[in-house]
């Protein structure tokens, strides 16, 4: 069974852009596309039955319109549509189960402000069991930039970023693109209290050779599995979010991993994913750690 690419829509230009992007990605991967919307009426008694029926009818027509536009652009693509009643977060997280990826729209506000992601989107990213891809409205008709890489962040031990690396290499292989793997590093806090240790570290060649080897070790199994995908490793000292964002000029997609962070307020995303999804000018895929 081929897992579908699922796109969540709400009728906005951003969600139409997400649907167009999802359609192209489904064609590249040979996967079916599922177009989904959630509609949520106020509590019983606030609306009468006719108004509830209007909500449901609007959702069905909106999904049908968007699904039809994607199907017209890709006649051989299998497209299904679904409108469900319920809170958007619950519906989208449920739709993410069994999907290869869930695609959502993001609102664009210019290169300096970055794009804002609503609370629904952030909660879905934090809870979804599959990669969540965020697409801006101005990405609707733009073909994926030829010559640009799939940029992926790698951190920690090889297994820590395995899911993100797998998604990045699969996407690159489907597009005939390269992978630019980025690892950011910083000095451990101990060096602030022990200048002598820093001198010894410099004499030993510094930390960058270790970080370069760590990235090479993480990439090795994916290079072997995808020998046709060109790979450019990039190791740089600095904040992981800032180092990744500095690569956006070379990216047609940025891929970051996501660990589950739980608090009294519920699931939340980490600082690196938060920085990238709010400031990257290109589509961003947030991949849960396996």
Residue spans for each PLM region:
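Structural beta-alpha unit
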Residues: 1, 14, 69-102, 109, ...
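Small/aliphatic-rich secondary-structure junction motif
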Residues: 1-49, 148-201, 223-226, 230-232, ...
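General small-molecule cofactor/ligand-binding pocket signal
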Residues: 34-36, 80-84, 133, 180-182, ...
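A short acidic, glycine-rich active-site loop
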Residues: 51-62, 200-211
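Short beta-strand elements of ligand-binding domains
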Residues: 105-106, 132-137, 285-288
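Short, structured interface segments
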Residues: 121-141
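Protein-protein interaction modules outside structured cores
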Residues: 209, 232-246, 250-290
């Amino acid at each position: 069974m081929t897992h579908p690419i699922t796109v969540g829509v709400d009728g906005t230009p951003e969600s139409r852009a997400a649907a167009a992007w999802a359609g192209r990605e489904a064609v590249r991967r040979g996967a079916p596309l599922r177009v989904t919307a959630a509609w949520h009426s106020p509590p019983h008694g606030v609306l009468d039955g006719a108004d509830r029926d209007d909500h449901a009818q609007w959702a069905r027509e909106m999904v049908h319109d968007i699904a039809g536009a994607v199907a017209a652009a890709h006649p051989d693509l299998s497209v299904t549509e679904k409108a469900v009643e319920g809170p958007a977060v619950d519906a989208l997280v449920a739709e993410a189960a069994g999907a290869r990826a869930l695609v959502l729209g993001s609102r664009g506000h210019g290169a300096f402000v970055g794009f804002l992601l609503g609370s629904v989107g952030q909660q879905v990213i934090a809870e979804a069991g599959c990669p969540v891809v965020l697409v801006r409205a101005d990405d609707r008709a733009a073909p994926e930039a030829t010559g640009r890489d799939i940029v992926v962040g790698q951190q920690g031990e090889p297994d820590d970023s395995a899911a993100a690396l797998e998604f990045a290499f699969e996407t690159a292989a489907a597009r005939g693109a390269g992978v630019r793997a980025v690892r950011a590093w910083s000095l451990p806090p101990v060096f602030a209290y022990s200048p002598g240790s820093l001198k010894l570290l410099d004499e030993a060649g510094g930390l960058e050779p270790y970080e370069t080897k760590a990235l090479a070790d993480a990439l090795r199994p994916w290079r072997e599995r995808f020998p046709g995908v060109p790979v450019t490793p990039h190791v740089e000292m600095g904040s992981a979010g800032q180092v990744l964002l500095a690569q956006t000029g070379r990216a047609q997609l940025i891929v970051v991993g996501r660990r589950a962070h739980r608090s009294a307020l519920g699931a939340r995303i980490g600082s690196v994913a938060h920085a990238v999804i709010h400031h990257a000018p290109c589509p961003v895929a947030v991949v849960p750690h396996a």
